[in-house]
């Protein structure tokens, strides 16, 4: 029986062979974010649909992802579709994250702020995260002016957030 762990482990092994672990890790995060942007589940529904043939789904994957993701990740999506297990894609990616973080003894994080951080601020954040995760941290920064002020730190398994936008959402939810 095929399971998500087997797909996740296979993706990890391929990414290691191709020396693209970090790139595929980032692409997996982007892909999951993309899947969540389809709030109605339409992308997942389409790729799990019985109305489309497997060759149609493969063409769709090529059309949607080939120019935006590395070939290893696109091939991973194709294999999981051809085997008829696209419903497991999110779980498989989570197993991939687990493999990367445990095998490489690193934690990937994305630091999102409303403004650019100084190297001193960045070093302080990294030191805090390494202490918290008890492992080496590899990071990527991003600026999101909609945060207004504050910070958001994302990893595969944690979310740390303290910003004005988040506070405003909580206040508005209280009144609605």
UniProtKB/Swiss-Prot annotation:
Subcellular compartments: Cell membrane
InterPro entries: ATP_synth_OSCP/delta_N_sf, ATPase_OSCP/d_CS, ATPase_OSCP/dsu
Molecular function via GO: proton-transporting ATP synthase activity, rotational mechanism
Membrane disposition: Peripheral membrane protein
GO biological process: proton motive force-driven ATP synthesis
Main location: membrane
Entry annotated with the keyword Cell membrane: yes
Keywords per UniProt: ATP synthesis, Cell membrane, CF(1), Hydrogen ion transport, Ion transport, Membrane, Transport
Entry GO CC: plasma membrane; proton-transporting ATP synthase complex
Family annotation (Gene3D superfamilies): N-terminal domain of the delta subunit of the F1F0-ATP synthase
Transmembrane found in the keyword field: no
Matching PROSITE patterns: ATPASE_DELTA
PANTHER family: ATP SYNTHASE DELTA CHAIN (PTHR11910)
Function text: F(1)F(0) ATP synthase produces ATP from ADP in the presence of a proton or sodium gradient. F-type ATPases consist of two structural domains, F(1) containing the extramembraneous catalytic core and F(0) containing the membrane proton channel, linked together by a central stalk and a peripheral stalk. During catalysis, ATP synthesis in the catalytic domain of F(1) is coupled via a rotary mechanism of the central stalk subunits to proton translocation.
Similarity comment: family membership: Belongs to the ATPase delta chain family.
Assembly with partners or alone: F-type ATPases have 2 components, F(1) - the catalytic core - and F(0) - the membrane proton channel. F(1) has five subunits: alpha(3), beta(3), gamma(1), delta(1), epsilon(1). F(0) has three main subunits: a(1), b(2) and c(10-14). The alpha and beta chains form an alternating ring which encloses part of the gamma chain. F(1) is attached to F(0) by a central stalk formed by the gamma and epsilon chains, while a peripheral stalk is formed by the delta and b chains.
Protein name as annotated: ATP synthase subunit delta
Lineage, highest ranks first: Bacteria, Bacillati, Mycoplasmatota, Mycoplasmoidales, Mycoplasmoidaceae
Gene name tied to this protein: atpH
């Amino acid at each position: 029986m095929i399971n998500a762990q087997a797909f996740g482990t296979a993706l990890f092994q391929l990414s290691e062979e191709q020396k693209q672990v970090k790139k595929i890790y980032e692409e997996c995060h982007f892909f999951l974010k993309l899947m969540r942007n389809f709030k109605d589940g339409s992308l997942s529904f389409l790729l799990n649909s019985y109305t489309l043939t497997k060759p149609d789904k493969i063409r769709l994957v090529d059309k949607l992802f080939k120019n935006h993701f590395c070939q290893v990740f696109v091939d991973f999506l194709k294999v999981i579709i051809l085997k008829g297990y696209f419903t497991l894609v999110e779980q498989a990616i989570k197993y991939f994250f687990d493999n990367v973080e445990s095998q490489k003894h690193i934690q990937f994080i994305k630091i999102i702020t409303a403004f650019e951080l100084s190297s001193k601020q960045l070093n302080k954040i990294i030191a805090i995260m390494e202490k918290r995760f008890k492992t080496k941290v590899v990071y990527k920064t991003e600026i999101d002016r909609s945060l207004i002020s504050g910070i958001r730190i994302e990893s595969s398994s944690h979310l740390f957030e303290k910003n004005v936008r988040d506070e405003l959402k909580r206040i508005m939810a209280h009144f609605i």
